[in-house]
Amino acid sequence: MRRTHYCGELNAKNIGEKVYLSGWVHRIRHHGGLIFIDLRDRSGIVQLVFDPSISKESYDIADTVGNEWVISVEGKVRKRPEGMENPKIPTGEIEIEVEKIKIENTAKPLPFNLWTNKEIDEIVRLKYRYLDLRRDKMQSNIIFRHNFILSIRNFLAKNGFIEIETPYLIVSTPEGARDFIIPSRLQPGKFYALPQSPQLFKQILMVAGFDRYFQIARCFRDEDLRADRQPEFTQLDMEMSFIEVEDVFTIIEELFKTVLKEVMNIEINTPFPRLSYEDAMNTYGSDKPDLRYDLKIVDVTNILKDLPLEFIRSTIEKDGVIKGIVLKNIVPSRREWSIIENKVRELKGKGIMWFTYADGELKSSISKYLDENIKDKLIKNLNLKSGDSFFCIAGTWKDVVKILGILRLEVAELFNMEKKEGLFFLWITDFPLFEYDEEERRIVAEHHPFTSPKDEDIPLLDTNPLKVKAKCYDLVLNGTELGSGSIRIHKKEIQEKVFNILGITPEDAKKKFGFLLEAFEYGAPPHGGIALGIDRIIAILTNSNSLREVIAFPKTQSGTCLLTGAPSEVDPKQLEEVHIKVVYPEEKKEED
């Protein structure tokens, strides 16, 4: 039998037609001397009817099949009897009167119920991924992903972008996360790395004159995993020549506007709002704020700085700050204040000062230190109304905004605050070019070493590099960073200066990035771009809790594939061919 239709595409217009269908047995029912089978393929479900008066042979075969068996059938489309229609499915008006059936394959009893509404153990789901992927939600996610990427490709092609593949086997440049490395058989002792991003190659493509590049790129990072990380992931990688930051914003905003309308029929407003890095940290305590909550951080340093409290005096002497969050129409209980207090201490804060305002009176955990003048200033500056509360903490700017950024979301959850519905995009701009890493005790790149400093800050590279702002930007959606981009350095002397500040010696720079530096000497145009995480975008748009829900074959949090058993040991001969000897850590030796 040769399939003529997909199951889910049949409807009343097909009544009277002979069809050939193939798929999986979704459900079996015996009723009134007939057998009903719901046949499923990726397009949906259609009802088959086996009537012994029409084909006794087909009826007898149908009586032997089980759930998830694979069958093919030949039959005629007919209207369902009146009152037996199913408006919940697209094929609910019709059914197939089966004349012939062929069993293509049987199925063992399933290790889990594919169609339960209960949560299924994820370990079992990942081990039997081929079964898990049959489930409606998983099929829907993967097909949505395909449609989303297809729409991206079409949009970019129409806007003059060329899709170009860059190498997977590259030179290792371990400046960010760890590289996955691959030994070379032909050159003993040398290694390739899998790309963490196509960054250098896309810049080279701009030097080569391709002007507008994109790629749906596979990237690899050997790092500790969380729910929002995978060792291999997919990003939309883009680069453009002769552009400024505004050009990147415009094309990305238009891309999302077009793709979301085409794939989801969602209208979004553009341009997206923008916040500088400093404003985002001061207002939300995060460089990826979730704008679905209205909670904002407020500064009360000037109001409380003169209080006769040792920890405040110490904070002010060290140029610290006092910041907090107003809780509108909320008066926390003692237990709730304790929860907030404990969270602050868990985050290495010094505790909280709390205030509640009711019936014209401001009460506080530090009431005895507050005179009427300070109380009035707090009420006025914080716009407190009866039934409002406020808490604040003191410390260094960096510590305070970080703690409050986390607390902002914890408090919203604690008090079940209303979260606005919709997609809230936001550009974060004006990042510092460098930051000081306390653990490594050195200056490191805030994003990566190829980001251009702002033109007006270039002189600061020689005098005060930590004050230099970058032509850099992040795109945030509902509190998740979708990706980063920047205008790149395109002049050799500035790139060398940045390398020097980062402690990359001329010898190391030549060894790792010599091809890029040399390319800059052959007419490199101004250029910039962005990389957006496809997996994260799809997870948000499908309301998925984990990236594993939107990737066909993901890894676990320990980086393993439960389906195939990767990573695995290899044949000693394979190791010998690439001149590798495995030296196990002590704990592995003890296990053996």
Swiss-Prot record:
What UniProt keywords are attached to this protein's entry?
A: Aminoacyl-tRNA synthetase, ATP-binding, Cytoplasm, Ligase, Nucleotide-binding, Protein biosynthesis
- Superkingdom, natural source: Bacteria
Which PROSITE patterns is this protein grouped with? AA_TRNA_LIGASE_II
Question: Where, subcellularly, is it found?
Answer: Cytoplasm
Predominantly, its location class is cytoplasm
- InterPro entries listed in its UniProt record: Aa-tRNA-synt_II, aa-tRNA-synth_II, aa-tRNA-synth_II/BPL/LPL, Asp-tRNA-ligase_1, Asp-tRNA-ligase_1_N, Asp/Asn-tRNA-synth_IIb, AspRS_core, GAD-like_sf
Which is one Pfam family of this protein?
tRNA_anti-codon
Which residues does the record give as L-aspartate binding sites?
Answer: 175, 221, 447, 488
- Please give the HAMAP family that the UniProt record associates with this protein: Asp_tRNA_synth_type1 (MF_00044)
The protein in question is named Aspartate--tRNA(Asp/Asn) ligase
